[in-house]
Amino acid sequence: MKLKSLLSVFTISIVALTSACSTKNAGPSADPDKLIVALIPDENAATVIQDNQGLKDYLTEAFDKEIELVVTTDYSSMIEAARNDRLDLAYFGPLSYVLAKAVSDIEPFAARIKGGTKTYNSCIIGNTKKGVTSFDDIKGTTFALGDPASTSSRLFPELTLAENGLTKGKDFQGVFLGSHDAVALAVQNGNAQAGGMACPILKSLKKKGVIDPSKVTTIAQSSPIPQYPWTMRSTLSPELKEKIRFTFLDLDSDKVLKPFNADGFASITDSDYDGIRKAGKLLGLDLSKFVK
């Protein structure tokens, strides 16, 4: 599918989703004919939609239902859609999941497995030309962050910096750019001297040739973070929820898994994300303020 067509599909999806969120009705069906599947907007939306056509085809066949993939404009919009019961399935980041769970009737059921683990890391990166290769070099710089509700492009970068004696607004100026790829490009281009983003996305961007390893260096990695969870609307029928669980946990298609940089998906529960809640408290963040 051409990029122009994909952008049209993306725009239509967002308009439809926004319209639906503003329409009052008796409530969503427990076994809808069409499943709305939201993917986290951590990279360019058109790219996310394009890369996940394999997922759409897989779910269409597995459930014998129409599948609509949507990518909201930002994390807050995705949380708001979940709060209004407009998402049947949603792939959240760890922090955005915690925020959504606080205001929505959703439940996590699967998380990405890579290299035998259900965790990943956030990377602190620096512009080598600007000489930003250590924590000391970050002082006085502009530090690029992703979305305010991002785990690995906001929460854990700030936590890692704080653990190394650096505070946003005091030791460096933080700027939110919305997505991980925007952070990487800003650091590479020198618009920001350092930044924080998911290590797997950085690795992918280097592999694609988008980021030049000679221009962007990894200063540090965070402590392990629980992987992005797949969630489902709790008001779906028990039969459909069980089928959804099985469909994802049994998934072994390279075509579907490749965009997630995953070997598969494994069961996960809400308690796996208590560490995210604790990280927010350590930084003194009022997580309720992240939700509109």
From Swiss-Prot:
Q: Which residues belong to the signal peptide in this entry? A: 1-20
Lipidated residue numbers (N-palmitoyl cysteine): 21
* UniProt xrefs under InterPro entries: PhnD
Q: Which SUPFAM superfamilies match?
A: Periplasmic binding protein-like II (SSF53850)
Q: How does it sit in the membrane?
A: Lipid-anchor
Question: Which GO biological process entries does UniProt record here?
Answer: transmembrane transport
The record's keywords, sorted A to Z, are: Cell membrane, Lipoprotein, Membrane, Palmitate, Signal
Q: Keyword Disulfide bond: yes or no?
A: no
List locations, semicolon-separated: Cell membrane
Query: One GO CC term of this entry?
Result: ATP-binding cassette (ABC) transporter complex
Can you locate the S-diacylglycerol cysteine lipid attachment residues? Answer: 21
Q: Which family does it belong to?
A: Belongs to the phosphate/phosphite/phosphonate binding protein family.
Q: What does this protein do?
A: Probably part of the ABC transporter complex PhnC2D2E2. Binds strongly to methylphosphonate (MPn), ethylphosphonate (EPn) and inorganic phosphite.
Q: How does it assemble?
A: The complex may be composed of two ATP-binding proteins (PhnC2), two transmembrane proteins (PhnE2) and a solute-binding protein (PhnD2).
**What name does UniProt use for this protein?**
Probable ABC transporter phosphonate/phosphite binding protein PhnD2
Q: Which organism is it from?
A: Prochlorococcus marinus (strain MIT 9301)
Name the gene behind this protein: phnD2
